[in-house]
A protein has these predicted regions:
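N-terminal leader/targeting segments
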Residues: 1-46
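Short, compact, well-ordered microdomains
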Residues: 55-84
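Terminal, regulation- and interaction-focused segments at domain boundaries
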Residues: 42-57
Length: 84
């Protein structure tokens, strides 16, 4: 998927009514389909994982939407996926 389109999809996806358990783990599983060795980094209130452009460019729109629904977003400062 085009990177700018992926960012747009993330911003527009309604996540209010989406309920799923293990949102962090599920997002990491999706990322693992597009990156051989996902190595997340953790802080007290955020998780960062995978180069955004590298993974999003390989994803179909459905996976980008799923990531948004799971609460993953584009961290512009670090150019990666993030979850709070």
């Amino acid at each position: 998927m085009d990177i700018e389109k992926a960012k747009e999809v993330l911003e527009k996806t309604d996540t209010e009514i989406f309920v799923e358990k293990n949102k962090v783990m599920r997002g990491l599983q999706i990322l693992a389909k597009y990156e051989e060795n996902v190595m997340p980094q953790f802080d007290h209130d955020i998780i960062w994982a995978s180069d955004f452009e590298e993974t999003a460019s390989q994803m179909p729109e459905e996976d980008v939407i799923q990531m948004a629904k799971l609460g993953w977003f584009y961290d512009e400062e670090n150019d990666c996926w993030a979850h709070c």
